[in-house]
Design a protein with these regions (language model features):
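Re-entrant/interfacial helical elements at transmembrane boundaries that shape
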Residues: 38-48, 61, 76-96, 127, ...
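Single conserved hydrophobic/aromatic residue that forms the stacking wall/gate
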Residues: 511-520
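Transmembrane alpha-helix interface/packing and boundary motifs in multi-pass membrane proteins
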Residues: 24-38, 68-80, 155-160, 255-264, ...
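N-terminal alpha-helical transmembrane segments of multi-pass membrane transport
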Residues: 1-59, 103-108, 114, 118-127, ...
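Membrane-interface alpha-helices at helix entry/exit sites of multi-pass transporters
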Residues: 55, 98-113, 286-294, 428
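Helix-loop-helix hairpins and the membrane-proximal interhelical loops
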Residues: 1-55, 190-293, 398, 506-508
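Hydrophobic transmembrane alpha-helices of multi-pass small-molecule transporters
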Residues: 1-11, 16-18, 157, 161-166, ...
Length: 520
């Protein structure tokens, strides 16, 4: 309790609030730009955080992460174009409401639900941290190795349209992550006699290349702007009343968001659809869904923001990224000298609580700014793509050059940009590649430590047996599900009968077929 209160007092230091506010503003901007999101936003600020105090760096990084899933509602509601993957389900009813002249009502309900979901996620994270020590102590090198293997399996299997593509993307990330000096022997690997590759490819370059470059290319191909017209004047109080009226729906979907967010690599890709499906399953009259039902906005938005708190649970406790943007967050930890795991709940507990407080305040700031300045922010969606794209290119190249001030970084950026464009066009999983890249060194070190300390005896330990069973069950169930979906239709992305493991409990949802977002 003492450290919790100390972190609260530190939160309101002017410098900390300034960095948090700056990060929140950047997060709001990248959330509005379709396809950018928290991963690209973090990649932009990462080159600058290594010169900051740890608390200030954490404030800026959390500030970038938290509000992206709030401001992405603007393009989703106003034009039917999801700002990030997490706002796809919001389009289903948000855009029809906008066409009926109720854009303000939809935005107000979305921002309010996002705020409550974000605070709920921060609360769940704080409770999880309190009980984390015995969980961490139960995981030795062998259990950690199997946990990382399970995470890689789930990331590869759940983040793409095809099981093989997802696993292959993850495996390719592991190979790329092994470029450079071997952590055990010190031997150079896949360097092709170039000094640049001895230390491996910088994480920021990989993140920007895979995620930012493909979206900018998409903007260059597009015509016009994100939105064509605005109608955000009337209906703000109606949206607030809608959220209060549906408070139990917010609570249920926020809980779902936390649970799904804790699954490595999964959160942002389907959490909004899980919440939307839950809403349809628990509602008697579903005739208005897809035509402008306000509950179709509240459910995915509350889950989408709550998942950020859930995704931080494996990130902080085990150093396993809960989503693609958490890879960049862990990279920031390395730059400022923070080690995920036991230290986060012991020696660095004050920083952990500071992150939790910052997450809650960033959600409040983000929702407040979006609601208070909605008319002005909405105009940002009217900026033509041909103006946005060059500005974003300049920002990305500046962030890339600031890492090592090495021209080879630009070559690597373009190379990973080509990989990102190829993956995007052919349905391969970019988050799986990024997470595999980040976990490559961790897998290698844990496998060596496990073999050196336990040999094969760790396989007979209780936690190891449970993890092995989960690995095998994940492979079987997801292979079966993907086969069934491919058999039913080659052209339709079906999310029927997916099974996700939350802890040791499966959460299943059915009777939901994903439509083509842009045809709403």
């Amino acid at each position: 309790m003492e450290q919790l209160l100390a972190a609260l007092f530190q939160l309101f230091e002017p410098t900390h609030l300034a960095f948090l506010f700056a990060g929140t503003l950047l997060g709001l901007i990248v959330g509005i730009l379709p396809g950018m999101g928290g991963t690209s936003g973090l990649a932009l600020v990462l080159p600058f955080v290594f010169t900051m105090e740890p608390s200030h760096a954490l404030a800026m990084m959390i500030g970038v992460l938290a509000p992206t899933t709030t401001s992405d509602t603007f393009p989703a509601v106003l034009m039917g174009v999801p700002g990030t993957a997490g706002s796809q389900a919001t389009v289903m009813d948000g855009f029809p409401l906008s066409k009926k002249g109720m854009a303000a009502r939809a935005l107000s309900a979305a921002f309010s639900a996002s705020l409550l979901g974000g605070i709920f996620g921060a609360f769940i994270l704080s409770v999880s941290i309190y009980y984390a020590i015995p969980i961490i102590m139960a995981f030795g090198f062998g259990e950690q190795f199997l946990l990382v293997v399970l995470a890689l399996l789930m990331v590869g299997a759940l983040t793409g349209d095809n099981l093989f593509k997802g696993i292959a993307s993850c495996f390719l990330g592991l190979i790329i992550g092994s470029i450079g000096t071997a952590p055990i022997t010190g031997d150079p690997r896949y360097t092709f006699n170039t000094l640049y590759l001895l230390e491996g490819v910088p994480l920021v370059v990989v993140g920007l290349g895979l995620f930012a470059i493909p979206e900018i290319v998409g903007l260059l191909d597009a015509k016009g702007s994100i939105a064509k017209s605005l109608n955000t004047k009337k209906g703000w109080f109606t949206g607030l009343k809608d959220v209060v009226k549906n408070w139990f729906l917010v609570l249920r979907c926020s809980t779902l968001g936390c649970l799904v967010g804790a699954l490595p690599g999964l959160g942002g890709t389907v959490v909004d659809w899980i919440a939307y499906s839950h809403l349809k399953q628990t509602t008697k009259d579903t005739s208005q869904f897809g035509k402008g039902d306000i509950r179709g906005v509240i459910a995915p938005e509350s889950a989408n923001n709550a998942k950020e708190g859930g995704a931080l649970i494996p990130t902080l406790i085990f150093g396993i990224p809960g989503s693609g943007n958490k890879v960049l967050l862990l990279g920031g930890f390395v730059l400022i000298g923070i080690e995920p795991g036991l230290d986060m709940v012991t020696t660095n507990l004050d920083l952990t609580y500071l992150m939790i407080w910052s997450l809650a305040i960033a959600n409040i700031l983000g929702a407040g700014i979006c609601m208070g300045f909605s008319s002005q922010i909405s105009k940002f969606t009217l900026v033509p793509y041909y103006i946005l794209a060059p500005v974003m290119v300049c920002l990305i190249f500046f962030a890339t050059f600031n890492i090592n001030r090495d021209w080879y970084d630009f070559i690597a950026l373009l190379a990973f940009g080509l990989i990102g464009i190829t993956f995007k066009n052919f349905g391969w999983s970019r988050p799986a590649l990024l997470i595999g890249f980040f976990l490559s060194t961790k897998v290698e070190l844990l496998s060596y430590q496990t073999h050196a300390v336990y040999g094969l005896s760790f396989l007979s330990r209780p936690v190891s047996i449970i993890l092995i069973v989960l690995c095998l069950a994940t492979i079987y169930l997801l292979s079966k599900q993907r086969f069934d979906n491919n058999y039913k239709s080659d052209n339709q992305k079906s999310k029927m009968s997916q099974i996700y493991y939350v802890g040791f409990l499966p959460v299943s949802y059915t009777h939901l077929t994903l439509p083509t977002i842009y045809s709403v």
